[in-house]
C-alpha cells in the first residue's frame, strides 16, 4: 500500500503526514496550492459585484452595538468593514442563505457562533429574532446539565453595505474579524467556482460549541478579563 500523504476531513480541513516535520509542511503547501489552482480555474471569468452603497448611519451602528451588548450581557466593541471584500460578500444575491449555512470549519463556532446575524430594515427585530433563535437552538440540542452561553451574535451582515464584527475586548474582536475575513473570502470563491458549499449540520456544531474542551478555551480567556472592558470613561 502506498504511504498516505494526507487526509481530507469533511467539513473541517486537510491534514498531511510525514515522519519529518518540514516535509509534512511541504506536503501541506503542495496540496493546498493544488486546490487553489483548481478553484481559480473553476472560477474562470466569473465575478461578483463589489459596488459600494451608502454606508449605514452612525446612529444605526450605535443602535446595533447597544442591542447586541444587551443580549451579550456586557458592553461590546464593534467594527464596520466596507472593504471591497466585505461589500462583495454583502452584495451576493443569496447572502442570507450562504451566510446562514454554518462556519467553514467547526471549531470556529466557539468564536463566531454557528451563524451570523443578517440585519433587515428593522434593526431591533432582526437582532432580537437572532437571539431568540439561538435560545431555541440551545433548547433543541442541549441536555439538562448544560448552561447556555449568551445568545448574542459575533458578526453581522448588512446586505449591500458591509460586515460588522463584535467583541467584548480588542483581542476577541481581532480574532472574530480575522475568522470572518477568511470565511467570506472562501464563501465567495466556492459560490463562484462550485455554485455552493455545505457546512456541518446544526446538531454536530452544537456538540462542538458546547464540548467541554472547547469551552475551556473561552473560560481561560474570560478569567483574564478586565472589569471595565468595553466601557468608555471620561476623566475630568
Which residues does each predicted region cover?
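Structural motif
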Residues: 13-14, 162-163, 232
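Conserved N-terminal Rossmann-fold NAD(P)-binding element of oxidoreductases
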Residues: 229, 233-236
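Functional cores that coordinate and move charged inorganic groups
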Residues: 1-40, 45
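Domain-length cofactor-binding catalytic modules of enzymes
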Residues: 26-226
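Short beta-strand segments
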Residues: 8-11, 111, 157-159, 236
Amino acid at each position: 500500500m502506498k504511504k498516505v500523504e494526507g487526509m481530507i476531513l469533511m467539513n473541517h480541513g486537510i491534514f498531511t503526514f510525514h515522519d519529518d516535520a518540514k516535509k509534512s509542511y511541504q506536503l501541506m503547501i503542495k496540496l493546498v496550492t493544488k486546490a487553489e489552482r483548481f478553484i481559480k480555474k473553476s472560477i474562470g471569468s466569473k465575478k461578483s459585484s463589489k459596488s459600494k452603497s451608502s454606508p449605514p448611519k452612525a446612529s444605526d451602528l450605535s443602535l446595533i452595538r447597544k442591542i447586541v451588548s444587551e443580549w451579550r450581557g456586557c458592553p461590546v466593541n464593534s467594527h464596520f468593514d466596507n472593504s471591497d471584500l466585505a461589500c462583495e460578500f454583502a452584495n451576493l444575491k443569496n447572502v442570507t442563505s450562504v451566510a446562514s449555512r454554518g462556519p467553514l470549519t467547526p471549531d470556529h463556532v466557539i468564536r463566531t457562533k454557528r451563524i451570523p446575524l443578517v440585519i433587515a430594515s428593522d434593526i431591533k427585530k432582526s437582532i432580537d429574532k437572532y437571539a431568540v433563535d439561538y435560545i431555541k437552538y440551545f433548547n433543541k440540542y442541549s441536555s439538562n446539565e448544560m448552561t447556555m452561553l449568551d445568545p448574542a451574535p459575533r458578526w453581522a451582515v448588512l446586505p449591500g453595505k458591509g460586515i460588522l464584527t463584535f467583541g467584548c475586548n480588542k483581542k476577541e474582536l481581532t480574532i472574530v474579524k480575522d475568522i470572518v475575513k477568511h470565511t467570506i473570502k472562501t464563501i465567495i470563491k466556492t459560490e463562484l467556482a462550485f455554485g455552493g458549499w455545505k457546512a456541518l449540520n446544526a446538531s454536530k456544531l452544537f456538540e462542538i460549541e458546547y464540548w467541554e474542551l472547547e469551552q475551556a478555551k473561552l473560560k481561560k480567556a474570560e478569567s483574564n478579563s478586565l472589569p471595565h472592558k468595553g466601557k468608555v470613561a471620561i476623566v475630568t
